[in-house]
A protein has these predicted regions:
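Serine-esterase "nucleophile elbow" of acetyl-processing enzymes
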Residues: 1-46, 56-65
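Alpha-helical cap/lid subdomain in secreted, periplasmic
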Residues: 29-36, 52-207
């Protein structure tokens, strides 16, 4: 199961090529890669905070008993200036709930943001630096937890980063926050390569 907010739902900002902002969830691309061995379900709610994800976790995830649950959340919390430690407490609760039920959690880090020309102003640079720092703090906690539990995790932040500017690469986002089809395909490709291609996915349960 793929569980999270708009980045799991596959939201895209409307463009000339995609005027309706059609959803392209990475879970659909992951299903194509995995094939018919297992069913990949997607549960993403746009605008959702990690506390709301915790509330949904039991009836949505635990009720289905998937073999794995990919958990991507925290971007909206950061947008509301929630502290990384508080966000991590919610993510940790979901990781631990999954493990207690024999479900393998797959933690995913939150991506950077793209502010473009706003970096030309001192105020814009300060805003970006603050947001980048909190993202790094949260992602460090996510990856540290995964390492401590010997869990496979996907570093979406690093995978979609523009190294020179430390912003979300423009080829992966057209609004500075959500991903493009290329970005969502990247998540699926990397999850398949780094997590699911290594696992035995022959059980009749869903992912």
């Amino acid at each position: 199961m793929c569980f999270g907010d708009s980045l799991t739902a596959g939201f895209q900002a409307p463009t000339a090529d995609n005027p309706r902002g059609v959803m392209t969830p990475y879970g659909s691309f992951l299903q194509e890669l995995i094939g018919s061995v297992v069913r990949v379900s997607v549960s993403g709610v746009c605008g959702e905070l990690t506390g709301e994800m915790v509330t949904r976790f039991r009836p949505v995830v635990l009720a289905q008993q998937p073999t794995h649950v990919v958990i991507l959340g925290g971007t909206n919390d950061l947008g509301w200036n929630r502290a990384p430690a508080d966000i991590m407490r919610n993510l940790l609760e979901m990781y631990e709930l999954a493990l207690a039920e024999g479900i393998t959690p797959v933690p995913v880090t939150v991506p950077s943001v793209r502010v473009g020309d706003d970096l030309r102003s001192e105020e814009g640079r300060r805003w970006f630096a603050e947001h980048l720092d909190r993202r790094r703090q949260l992602n460090g906690l996510i990856l540290g937890y995964a390492q401590s539990k010997r869990l496979a995790a996907f570093d979406l932040f690093a995978a979609t980063l523009e190294p020179d500017s430390q912003q979300l690469a423009d080829r992966y986002s057209n609004d500075g926050l959500h991903l493009t089809t290329s970005g969502y395909r990247l998540i699926a490709d990397r999850l398949y390569q780094e997590v699911f291609a290594r696992d035995e996915l022959s059980e009749p349960r869903g992912e």
